[in-house]
Amino acid sequence: MSEVVTAAPAPPVVRLPPAVRGPKLFQGLAFVVSRRRLLGRFVRRYGKAFTANILMYGRVVVVADPQLARQVFTSSPEELGNIQPNLSRMFGSGSVFALDGDDHRRRRRLLAPPFHGKSMKNYETIIEEETLRETANWPQGQAFATLPSMMHITLNAILRAIFGAGGSELDELRRLIPPWVTLGSRLAALPKPKRDYGRLSPWGRLAEWRRQYDTVIDKLIEAERADPNFADRTDVLALMLRSTYDDGSIMSRKDIGDELLTLLAAGHETTAATLGWAFERLSRHPDVLAALVEEVDNGGHELRQAAILEVQRARTVIDFAARRVNPPVYQLGEWVIPRGYSIIINIAQIHGDPDVFPQPDRFDPQRYIGSKPSPFAWIPFGGGTRRCVGAAFANMEMDVVLRTVLRHFTLETTTAAGERSHGRGVAFTPKDGGRVVMRRR
């Protein structure tokens, strides 16, 4: 009696979305110089899914469809892994941005406690204090850019949240972090040269600042561990130093340094940019502003939370999230994508999709009163297993800053056209810095 041999099913045939026409070099340079405008034009020409060839990432499938975004964000890390290259080029191999699979899951579990529960209440006071300190010297009745002030507030707040009390080392970090973030944000969008051009090159300057940063962090870790009250400290560094993985192991000194730099950089520029946009938007929407001031005076917060959500949608600061295909093929909706391709979720285009957000150009916090936004259409923090670990902290910080400013200042409205978006490499900020006129109440 002969055996019946059943053949393994053939893998799906590769089927890619429409391909963008044009040489790889042109697509890559256009992506670096003006990616938001470029991707918007491609969506209008090719639809909500298309294939491109981008200098730094190679072959990519770009999607601007919430249903496809849902599938990407809910796929396992074994199917869709970390895009290459990623921001670990800036922060180091010990950053959560560098990790994948089990290592990434373990690290996120370790990082979660400082950004949830009781820890968050401790940070509210810090943020309010830093807001009052920064706004004490605001000009009265004169236009000024709010973005630099927001950068100061968010940097000082995250420094105090991470390290506790101040000191000379924190002053050194205040000197190092802003230029590092500005340069690093721009270099993140560019391929890294294989040759080392020394300290005078942009990458060389970044490396030199990193060496200075590491020296400061070593001193801070030593001081933290030597503190007689170390076991009772609630700052992020103390929580990280006391935390252990499931097997009892602890984070290495290098990993702590990389992770702290990630929190300092990623946790300050993006939040500051969103706050700058918030003041820019509110100054041009008097009805929303008046309702927010009334709510603040009455001790409410629902509309303020909705306004923060709407700013993050209408003026998206981080415009894409990405994954890399690991299996031989990955089926995304009707498309079949081969291994080695990357998938880019076009956050900015999804946030501006009229099928998802009616009248998307209208600034309307009422969209979120009484209902939560879809986690796969409203995605300023990305989604899935790689969603920003500090999202709750960032939203709380924005809430406290707006509440404090509106409680103490009158924001004058204007009929001027809205500010254009300015790309800083990774983040998009108001081109004129969110210029407004304030008067103390």
Swiss-Prot record:
PROSITE patterns: CYTOCHROME_P450 (PS00086). InterPro entries: Cyt_P450 (IPR001128), Cyt_P450_CS (IPR017972), Cyt_P450_E_grp-I (IPR002401), Cyt_P450_sf (IPR036396), Cytochrome_P450_monoxygenase (IPR050121). Its cofactor is heme. Keywords: Heme, Iron, Metal-binding, Monooxygenase, Oxidoreductase. Heme binds at residue 388. Its EC number is 1.14.-.-. It comes from the Bacteria. Pfam families: p450. GO terms for molecular function: heme binding; iron ion binding; monooxygenase activity; oxidoreductase activity; oxidoreductase activity, acting on paired donors, with incorporation or reduction of molecular oxygen. Belongs to the cytochrome P450 family. This is Putative cytochrome P450 138. It comes from Mycobacterium tuberculosis (strain ATCC 25618 / H37Rv).
